[in-house]
């Protein structure tokens, strides 16, 4: 049993050593967008205002910016979701959660009180 535990710990250590460090990277997690002009050496130090896009209102996205995550306006690209003209008080039924839930090159967009593939 001790041998198995030791091998498991050595294996995990080997995987951890092989992973790239995120502290030296410039973080900006809003899909394809310009890089974060503020490199962060201590990610998450200032506290996150969101964890995922669902935590943000309307069409804002949860992005890495400076040293924390916050709701930000995503860049408008030709294949981006259109702005949602509706202000919803009661959420609808989502038909997707992420872009990979949609067929082909469609995106999972928040539109008319729910998320749909467009």
From Swiss-Prot:
Organism superkingdom: Eukaryota
Localization in the cell: Secreted
Disulfide feature: 30-63, 40-67, 50-62, 56-71, 81-109, 88-113, 96-108, 102-117
InterPro entries for this protein: Elafin-like_sf (IPR036645), WAP_dom (IPR008197)
Alphabetical GO biological process terms: defense response to bacterium; venom-mediated disruption of cell wall in another organism
Tissue expr: Expressed by the venom gland.
Signal peptide start-end: 1-24
Entry-linked Gene3D superfamilies: Elafin-like
GO cellular component, one term: extracellular region
WAP domain mapped to chain residues: 25-72, 74-118
GO molecular function, one term: peptidase inhibitor activity
Keyword set, alphabetical order: Antibiotic, Antimicrobial, Disulfide bond, Repeat, Secreted, Signal
Family annotation (PROSITE patterns): WAP
Protein's job: Damages membranes of susceptible bacteria. Has no hemolytic activity. Not toxic to mice. Does not inhibit the proteinases elastase and cathepsin G.
Homology family: Belongs to the venom waprin family.
Protein name per the record: Waprin-Enh1
Phylogenetic lineage: Eukaryota, Metazoa, Chordata, Craniata, Vertebrata
């Amino acid at each position: 049993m001790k041998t198995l535990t030791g091998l498991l710990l050595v294996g995990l250590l080997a995987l951890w050593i092989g992973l790239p460090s995120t502290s030296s990277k410039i973080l900006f997690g809003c899909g394809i967008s310009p890089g974060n002009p503020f490199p962060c050496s201590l990610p998450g130090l200032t506290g996150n205002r969101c964890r995922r896009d669902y935590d943000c209102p309307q069409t804002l996205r949860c992005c890495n910016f400076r040293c924390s995550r916050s709701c930000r306006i995503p860049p408008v690209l030709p294949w981006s979701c259109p702005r949602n003209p509706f202000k919803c008080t009661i959420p609808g039924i989502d038909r997707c959660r992420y872009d990979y839930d949609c067929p082909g090159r469609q995106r999972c967009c928040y539109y008319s009180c729910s998320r749909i593939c467009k």
